[in-house]
């Protein structure tokens, strides 16, 4: 005789709330991470939209020279940005109630800190929610692991780098041109193009794009025909079908002959693991590189490393990059730095006379 024991359903309001939060039958899964994710991302998104449209100029360098970033103050979609919190605030926690007035809070770039901190909490909770839903559905946890790469990258540029540099004013502005400015200044100050971790990140992103295109084109080119010439090949697939939709043997044979045999995967599972792991590991390394350069452990310096027998410098591309770095450094924050650090550190030659 088989006895079926049913769990007694809680009748309390809290019990029903818990069941609803953790139910996988909802159209959108909420989960306990979602309880924190939803308000933080809504807050970050709302403040970003309002500030991008209407925030007044921000004194980013702390020298009473405000920089305009919003649409209503003369910017467009490309030039507009949420200006980072002022250097006068540094790394201080700067909520609205810490300012003497809302005007002061806006002038010192308070919205940037508010948006960034809520955003980072939100995306971290989104990652946790991915794990939570996978766990409840009996799936493996690799979706959340893959998402940890962009979370690590965002944390590096919005939090770790400002901490290492001593001010949120060094964080990445929230806009298109602001992002480019951040990249240029980062190169000038840290020589990121000569950092091996950044090189691994470039290989991860470009390699991931290449492998994705190769995989998609191979699969699309080796579909098992289920339709006539007058129908789209896509109509030959039915959602949930058990049989394969493409011929992996044909794809393997094609690619093995195109390059060489062992360049082609004969295991679909290891292939898809590779497609996921390659860009994820690359972006992990980039985030780690940003986090180390935050504390001024910079890219390689090969300046003036090649000389002739007379001691004269033979320029290499490293010297060309160094010259570009100096030019970018003297141009950024031009009113905040009377003497850029790299130039001010050069010893003045003695004059005999």
Curated annotation (Swiss-Prot):
Originating species: Hordeum vulgare
Marked site positions, Cleavage: 344-345
Residues engaged in binding chlorophyll a PD1: 198
Subcellular location: Plastid, Chloroplast thylakoid membrane
MF terms (GO), sorted A to Z: chlorophyll binding; electron transporter, transferring electrons within the cyclic electron transport pathway of photosynthesis activity; iron ion binding; oxidoreductase activity, acting on diphenols and related substances as donors, oxygen as acceptor; oxygen evolving activity
EC numbers for this chain: 1.10.3.9
Transmembrane segments: 29-46, 118-133, 142-156, 197-218, 274-288
Modifications after synthesis and translation: Tyr-161 forms a radical intermediate that is referred to as redox-active TyrZ, YZ or Y-Z. C-terminally processed by CTPA; processing is essential to allow assembly of the oxygen-evolving complex and thus photosynthetic growth.
PANTHER family: PHOTOSYSTEM II PROTEIN D1 (PTHR33149:SF58)
Membrane topology, record value: Multi-pass membrane protein
GO BP term (any one): response to herbicide
Main function: Photosystem II (PSII) is a light-driven water:plastoquinone oxidoreductase that uses light energy to abstract electrons from H(2)O, generating O(2) and a proton gradient subsequently used for ATP formation. It consists of a core antenna complex that captures photons, and an electron transfer chain that converts photonic excitation into a charge separation. The D1/D2 (PsbA/PsbD) reaction center heterodimer binds P680, the primary electron donor of PSII as well as several subsequent electron acceptors.
Family designation: Belongs to the reaction center PufL/M/PsbA/D family.
Residue numbers covered by the propeptide annotation in the UniProt entry: 345-353
Pfam (any one): Photo_RC
Name of this protein: Photosystem II protein D1
Coiled-coil region(s): none
NCBIfam families to which the protein is assigned, alphabetical: psbA
Broad class of enzyme this protein falls into: oxidoreductase
Binding-site residues, a quinone: 215, 264-265
Site (Stabilizes free radical intermediate): residue numbering on this chain: 190
Binding-site residues for [CaMn4O5] cluster, renumbered to this chain: 170, 189, 332-333, 342, 344
Binding of Fe cation, residues: 215, 272
